């Protein structure tokens, strides 16, 4: 390793925040930092000092020091460049270079330090990239949360309005001298009076409890007042109304059954002591009249070793990609070995891969505007008619080796015009009246089911049906890059391994 640790300390050598990039005890790092001020010679303008075992590269920051602890054979020029990047990171997270401010943002600084250095070597990143990586901002997550909060507020407002209506109906019945309606189904006898709003809420929450037959109600003559039976017809009507507006309502039992079913149908991943995760994400933008505006695909092989006896291994990579993908290995991986023999191994074969942590050993990137590279083409043809628009949408799988699962093609609809009239359709559809979208759902698209169409009619203009968005997931990667064999460095004996492949969408739009 080259870089052992990075720390912010006081002029007395007290550690405020420290990140070790090799295995090192707390006593050891505190001892190194405590010895640091005693080694400095204030009469000389040096930015580093050395001992018999390590080198300190440092930069004063008002009353503090930014210190890098490296091995003595490290490149001092690279260390100084890395030190400058560390020093620029700290003001990004701390308003003042003071001990209290550094301590308050210690975790933010540690996360940023990890983006700069991996396995003791500096990553090729700049300040803007570090900020982006540490924020992990997701626009889709913000939109989802905002929509969810809006739905919850609307549902609560509707519940309050319905409760007021029921309370008013009960008061009207009492004024007319008739018995107020009771509530049954919560015990051996009916419960009358009380807060109507509370009873409605309790009815929805307690749908998973076993129902007991209500006691027969005494006849009280004909009444025009609103009646609530043991089965909660008003509640059922209200829930049906929410469902018709696109809200998903399910009882606790149903939710549990769905969760259990998901667990049963989820394919188990048999993880060996050596496990590879191959993940690809695609970002694609097409024009509505044809033509690929941009397609970018990022892939990575993540290695996870759970048994330290398999730490010194090599991965045999089979690259059958013919699309011109750009490959890049981790800085600690022997690039010459990979180029010559398609083997992924550490530069120092005596070293071991980290245990119980995901390590990215190989990544690739593909960027193109070639239409033949589009994995799934979508054609949307809206044509104006006398009553609005007739929309025809077609899909076609261009990569026959792919199998796309859980495909959802989302088409925006004009607001305030009602539900679309569906003609012919391959698969299923969902109409979301709240979001004004039509979701075309296809469980599988593969070589046996590579094309399909959807036709519907709705009032609107052709521009109302764009952008069309697509989402899917696949267990086969787009770029045909696989790990075919894993062997140990000593003896070249084979090692059992498992692989998990995922190809998913980051953004897929037809504008």
Swiss-Prot record:
Domain of life: Eukaryota
Name of the protein in question: Coatomer subunit delta
Entry GO CC: COPI vesicle coat; COPI-coated vesicle; endoplasmic reticulum; Golgi apparatus; Golgi membrane
Record localization: Cytoplasm; Golgi apparatus membrane; Cytoplasmic vesicle, COPI-coated vesicle membrane
Gene, per the UniProt record: Arcn1
Chain positions covered by the region annotation Disordered: 168-188
Gene3D superfamilies (alphabetical): 3.30.450.60, Mu homology domain, subdomain B
Residue stretches of biased makeup (Basic and acidic residues): 168-177
Taxon lineage: Eukaryota, Metazoa, Chordata, Craniata, Vertebrata
Family: Belongs to the adaptor complexes medium subunit family. Delta-COP subfamily.
Sites bearing N6-acetyllysine, chain numbering: 233, 241, 309, 351
């Amino acid at each position: 390793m080259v870089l052992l640790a990075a720390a912010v300390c006081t002029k007395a050598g007290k550690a405020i925040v420290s990140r070790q990039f090799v295995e090192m005890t707390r006593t050891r790092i505190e001892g190194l930092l405590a010895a640091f001020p005693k080694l400095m010679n204030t009469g000389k303008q040096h930015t580093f000092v050395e001992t018999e075992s390590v080198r300190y590269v440092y930069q004063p920051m008002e009353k503090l020091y930014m210190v890098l602890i490296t091995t003595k054979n490290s490149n001092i020029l690279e260390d100084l460049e890395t030190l400058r990047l560390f020093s620029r990171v700290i003001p990004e997270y701390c308003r003042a270079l003071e001990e209290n401010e550094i301590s308050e943002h210690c975790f933010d600084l540690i996360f940023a330090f990890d983006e700069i250095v991996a396995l003791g070597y500096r990553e090729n990143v700049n300040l803007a990239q570090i900020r982006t990586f540490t924020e992990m901002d997701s626009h889709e997550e913000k939109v989802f949360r905002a929509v969810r909060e809006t739905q919850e507020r609307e549902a609560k407002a509707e519940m309050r309005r319905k409760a007021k209506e029921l309370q008013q109906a009960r008061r009207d019945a009492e004024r007319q001298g008739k018995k107020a309606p009771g509530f049954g189904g919560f015990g051996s006898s009916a419960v009358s009076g009380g807060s109507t709003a509370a009873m409605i809420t309790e009815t929805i929450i307690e749908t998973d409890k076993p129902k007991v037959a209500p006691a027969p109600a005494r006849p009280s003559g004909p009444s025009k007042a609103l009646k609530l039976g043991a089965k909660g017809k008003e509640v059922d009507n209200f829930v049906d109304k929410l469902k018709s507006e696109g809200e998903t309502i399910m009882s606790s039992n149903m939710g549990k059954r769905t969760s259990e079913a998901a667990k049963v149908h989820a394919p188990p991943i048999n993880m060996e002591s050596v496990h590879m995760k191959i993940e690809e994400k695609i970002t694609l933008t097409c024009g509505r009249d044809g033509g690929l505006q941009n397609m970018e695909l990022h892939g990575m092989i993540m290695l996870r070793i759970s048994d330290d006896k398999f730490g010194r291994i090599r991965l045999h990579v089979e690259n059958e990609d013919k699309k011109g993908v750009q490959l890049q290995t981790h800085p600690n991986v022997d690039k010459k070995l990979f180029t010559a023999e398609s083997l992924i191994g550490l530069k120092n074969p005596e070293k071991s891969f980290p245990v119980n942590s995901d390590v990215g050993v190989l990544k690739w990137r593909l960027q193109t505007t070639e239409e033949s590279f589009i994995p799934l083409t979508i054609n949307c043809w809206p044509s104006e008619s006398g009553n609005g628009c007739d929309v025809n949408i077609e899909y076609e799988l261009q990569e026959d080796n792919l199998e796309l699962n859980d495909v959802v093609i989302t088409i925006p609809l004009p607001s305030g015009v009602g539900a679309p009239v569906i003609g012919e359709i391959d698969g299923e559809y969902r109409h979301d009246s709240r979001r004004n979208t039509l979701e075309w759902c296809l469980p599988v698209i593969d070589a046996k089911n590579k094309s399909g169409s959807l036709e519907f009619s709705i009032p609107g203009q052709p521009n109302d049906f764009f952008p069309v968005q697509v989402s899917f997931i696949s267990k086969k990667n787009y770029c045909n890059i696989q790990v075919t064999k894993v062997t140990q460095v000593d003896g070249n004996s084979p090692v059992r391994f498992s692989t998990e492949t995922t190809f998913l969408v980051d953004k897929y739009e037809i504008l």
